[in-house]
Amino acid sequence: MSLTNEKIVEAIAEKSIMEVMELVKAIEDRFGVSAAAPVMVSGSAAAAAPVEEQTEFTVTLKEAGAKKVEVIKAVRAVTGLGLKEAKDLTEAGGILKEAVSKEEAEKIKKELEAAGATVEVK
């Protein structure tokens, strides 16, 4: 049986932090390496670090628009809130979801805009 990298990562993800720490120590001992990050010597301060692409987004409801009932239904579907909480959030505006992937944020935005809401993804 051949282990793929994906299977190995999945197996590690199921372990506790203590088990992962023991695994790292065993790998260090077995291969004679260290998990410590190497120290980089900077040639100049002008060398800019690469810009990291944003991976987590926040979806914010700015305005409900004219179709308030449709927006409340969409907010309930997206957030899992009860009717009163969804109505309050729709009327006041605010953060619907935090720390979501770009794909999920775009999906939520499309659903709410289709219902008539104004949505912002940050």
From Swiss-Prot:
Gene Ontology biological process: translation
Keyword Oxidoreductase: no
Domain of life: Bacteria
One annotated GO molecular function: mRNA binding
GO cellular component entries: cytosolic large ribosomal subunit
Coiled coil (UniProt feature): none
Keywords: Ribonucleoprotein, Ribosomal protein
Pfam families: Ribosomal_L12, Ribosomal_L12_N
Keyword Ribosomal protein assigned: yes
Known role: Forms part of the ribosomal stalk which helps the ribosome interact with GTP-bound translation factors. Is thus essential for accurate translation.
Subunit structure: Homodimer. Part of the ribosomal stalk of the 50S ribosomal subunit. Forms a multimeric L10(L12)X complex, where L10 forms an elongated spine to which 2 to 4 L12 dimers bind in a sequential fashion. Binds GTP-bound translation factors.
UniProt xrefs under HAMAP family: Ribosomal_bL12
Entry's family note: Belongs to the bacterial ribosomal protein bL12 family.
Protein name, as recorded: Large ribosomal subunit protein bL12
Species assigned in the record: Xylella fastidiosa (strain M12)
